Amino acid sequence: MTRLAVLLGAGALLAGCRGGEPRLEFTPARVVSQDTENGATPMFLATPRGERVVGWISAPDGGADGSLHLSVTPAGAAGPRPVVTLRDPLGPIEAHGEAPPQLAADSSGGISVLYAVGREIPGQRWPVSALRFTRSTDGGRSWSPPVTVNDGTEFGAHNFHALTAAPDGSLLATWLDAREGRSGVWMSRSRDGGRTWTQNRPIYTDPTCPCCRTAVAVDAHGAIFVAWRAVLPGDVRDVVVTRSADGGSSWSPPVRARADGWVYPGCPHAGPSLKVDAHGVLHIGWWTGKDGEAGVYYARSDDGGRSFAALPIAVGKQARPAHVQLALDADSGVVVAWDDGLSEMPRVLLRRSADGGRSFGPAAELSEPGVAASYPVVAVYGDSLAVAWSQTTAAEHREKLADRADMKDPKAVMQLPRVGQSEILLRAAAR
C-alpha cells in the first residue's frame, strides 16, 4: 500500500533580521486529515484577515474519485473549524501535483478555490478536464455551487491553472488550453465574486509547454503578470513572463526570466511560481533542465517585468524536474521552497532572503531523510511561514515511477491521477 504523507510546517521568522537569515524551528508533525481516508495535493492560504486555510484531496481506496477538503483556522483561534468536504456534480476533482486546486483570498473577505474536474474518455489517450470555481463568504463554513470557468466545450484540454485576486476585488484565472489545436495560455476574469466569468481570451497562442502550470500575479495598480514555460524556436523550453496594463486587453512581448536555453522535446511538468510585492517588484522561481546548469533559479524584476536579475538557488550538472513555490513577507523577505532534483530521492528544501531576493541564506531541509518528498507549497502569515508537501517512501517512489505510462508509446493511455493511501500532517511553531 502506498503511503503518501503530506506535511505542513510553520516556523517563526526572526524580526529585524536584515543582517542574518531566519532560523526555522519545527514541532513534531500531527495528522490533520484524520477525518478523511487519505489525502494528497496539499494547499495552503493565509488570508489578509489572518485566517489559515489548509486543503487537500482524498479518494476512496486511494483512487481517482477525488473530493476536496478544506480546514480553516480563524485568526487568533487555537485550532481549526471542522473540515468541510466538497464534491463536484460533474465528476472527480483531480489530485494532480502539478495542477492542484488553487486558493485565493479577495478584499471583501471571500475565500476562493479553482480546481479541475477530470474525466477519462474511452478511446482517448489523455483525460479531459473542466475548470470549476467555488467561493466562501463565511470563512469556509459554506461554499457556493461550483461554476465552470472555461467556455466553449465544457470538458477539454483545460488545466494547469492559476488563480489570484486583484486589488479591485476581481478574480483572475489563467490556464493552459488546447481548444485551437495546440496548447496556449488563456485567461478569464470575474467581477462578481466568481458567479460569472468573462469570455475566455488567449494571452499567448504560440507553442507552449503543455503540462507545466501557469502563474498569475497582480500589483497594487492592477497590472497583471502571467508566467509559463514557452516552447521557443529550436525546442527551447524556457520560462517567460508577460505584462498587461489594461486589464488583459493587450500583453507585452514575453520576456525570459533567464536565458536558460534548455532544449527538450517533451514536457517536464514543472511550471513557475510568480509573486509581486507591495513595492511592485516581481519575483519568480522555476526549474530548468539544461545540462551543466540544471536546477532551481530565482529572479526579480524592478522594472515591471521588462528585465530580470537571476540567481541560482540549487543548481548542478543534471537534475530531475523540481517544483518551486515562492512566498513573500511584509519585510522584504522572499521564501523559496522546492523539491530537490539533485539528490537521489526528491526532498523538500527551503531558502530565505531577507533583502528582497538579492541574496539568500543556506538551504534548510524540511523533509525527513530516506523518503521521497515533492510538490511543496509555502505561505507566510504574520511572523510565521508554512510549508506543505507530499511524501512517500523511497521504495514506493521507485514503484510509482516504474508504473508511469510512457506517453511516447502511441498505444499508451494516461489515467487520471490517483490519490494513493496518503495522509495530511501538520507541524506548527511556537510564536
Language-model features: locations:
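Extracellular, repeat-based ectodomains that mediate carbohydrate processing or recognition
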Residues: 17-431
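Generic extreme N-terminus detector
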Residues: 4-5, 411
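Bacterial N-terminal signal peptides
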Residues: 5-15
